[in-house]
Amino acid sequence: MGPVSLLPKYQKLNTWNGDLAKMTHLQAGLSPETIEKARLELNENPDILHQDIQQVRDMIITRPDIGFLRTDDAFILRFLRARKFHQADAFRLLAQYFQYRQLNLDMFKNFKADDPGIKRALIDGFPGVLENRDHYGRKILLLFAANWDQSRNSFTDILRAILLSLEVLIEDPELQINGFILIIDWSNFSFKQASKLTPSILKLAIEGLQDSFPARFGGVHFVNQPWYIHALYTLIKPFLKDKTRKRIFLHGNNLNSLHQLIHPEFLPSEFGGTLPPYDMGTWARTLLGPDYSDENDYTHTSYNAMHVKHTSSNLERECSPKLMKRSQSVVEAGTLKHEEKGENENTQPLLALD
């Protein structure tokens, strides 16, 4: 899979002028189970798919302040799926998607995998992406927070790498319907590292992921979070939608509660799963292709050991061997701890994504 970049602006808005048979190609490749799930959970109806898409497209004229750089059927469809085919909500998300990019132009300049900042973040494992999906068909993303080397990667570049990864993944219509899971392992994440997570950059991430991207997140799982991450979470809660807050789960070092929501057979051994330890270079190799092996010397003796030699266009430097920190989670008896004390600990919100 090659690097992804923002598409050039369309000269003219697309209009639908085909028949139903032409439109149903948008569901091509979906399993019968996923098509039925889209019908039941997302209100997706192939008989009126063209009408739903066109209704969203017709709203573009109401926001002349925004440059809608892409308006084809497949692109608009992912926003409809993200908002359960409520056309007004889908258009609002579409507008926020492009407005976020207008307001943060520097973030999306050279927005592709071989951009030096994005490339470094990908090589350092931001994000990790598991090859297989969970039992609900959701893609699992991993963030090992302690591996953030602040001398190598800015928070913004890590965010750019995550957004670019989501752009690549969301091309899969199965994931548009089934969604994503994010697991953040805070093992060995120091107070000094946490001090760099200012409210302004956290707000930037929330706006980019929660408010401006057409992905369905079924859950955000914190593992091994220290007390100061709880404090940071308190700071960002006002920026989170109620739906988002209900889907954030704080597991501490008790993996049994995580396994209640994500079965161990879909998790690497770092999280008490039955899969092998996660290879931090897997996703970077997928996005960078030949560029990965040409410019970087990776030696994986295990998840713990990663040696990186990086050469940039402006500066040659050799990084000292970097120890990738392992999760300190344990599997022990316990129950799920939701972020809201006293709140019903029903897992249903994770099954019926909004």
Swiss-Prot record:
It is found in: Golgi apparatus, trans-Golgi network membrane; Early endosome membrane; Cytoplasmic vesicle, Clathrin-coated vesicle. SMART domains: CRAL_TRIO_N, SEC14. It is a peripheral membrane protein. Residues 345-354 have a biased composition (Polar residues). Keywords: Cytoplasmic vesicle, Endosome, Golgi apparatus, Lipid-binding, Membrane. GO terms for biological process: lysosome organization. GO terms for cellular component: clathrin-coated vesicle; early endosome membrane; endosome; trans-Golgi network. The keyword DNA damage does not apply. PROSITE patterns: CRAL_TRIO. GO terms for molecular function: phosphatidylinositol-3,5-bisphosphate binding. Residues 333-354 are annotated as: Disordered. Residues 335-344 have a biased composition (Basic and acidic residues). Residues 118-279 form the CRAL-TRIO domain. Required for normal morphology of late endosomes and/or lysosomes in neurons. Binds phosphatidylinositol 3,5-bisphosphate (PtdIns(3,5)P2). PANTHER family: ALPHA-TOCOPHEROL TRANSFER PROTEIN-RELATED, CLAVESIN-1. Forms a complex with clathrin heavy chain and gamma-adaptin. The CRAL-TRIO domain is required for targeting to the membrane and for binding PtdIns(3,5)P2. Binding to PtdIns(3,5)P2 is not required for localization. This is Clavesin-1. It comes from Pongo abelii. The gene is CLVS1.
